[in-house]
UniProtKB/Swiss-Prot annotation:
Organism superkingdom: Bacteria
Gene3D superfamilies named in the record: 30s Ribosomal Protein S14, Chain N
Subunit structure: Part of the 30S ribosomal subunit. Contacts proteins S3 and S10.
Protein name: Small ribosomal subunit protein uS14
Annotated family: Belongs to the universal ribosomal protein uS14 family.
Keyword Nucleotide-binding: no
Organism of origin: Chlorobium phaeovibrioides (strain DSM 265 / 1930)
GO MF entry, a single one: rRNA binding
InterPro entries hit by this protein: Ribosomal_uS14, Ribosomal_uS14_bac/plastid, Ribosomal_uS14_CS, Ribosomal_uS14_sf
Taxon lineage: Bacteria, Pseudomonadati, Chlorobiota, Chlorobiia, Chlorobiales
A GO cellular component annotation in the UniProt record: small ribosomal subunit
GO biological process assignments: translation
């Protein structure tokens, strides 16, 4: 499990990205890089990390499911992910 503070920080970044998305879009189209630079650093979408919704793990996360590889495998083998089954050929 990731530290709660790390997960909370990432959630705060998500909120900031959502809040400033329209303003950032306008400034980019206008080419006003000085005003863009004055926006909060964490309002940039590239600072948000995809994290597992169950464990908060930041690496090995399947974006489609929002789960890290460990939880994905566990839930898939338990049959809790609809439409997912173990491959065999």
């Amino acid at each position: 499990m990731a530290k709660k503070s790390v997960v909370a920080r990432n959630e705060k970044r998500k909120r900031l990205v959502e809040k400033y998305a329209a303003k950032r879009e306008e400034l980019l189209k206008a080419g006003d890089y000085e005003a863009l630079r004055k926006l909060p650093r964490d309002s940039s979408a590239s600072r948000v990390r995809n994290r597992c919704v169950l464990t908060g793990r930041g690496r090995g996360v399947y974006e489609k499911f929002g789960l890290c590889r460990h939880m994905f495998r566990k839930l898939a083998l338990e049959g809790k992910l609809p439409g997912v089954k173990k491959a065999s050929w």
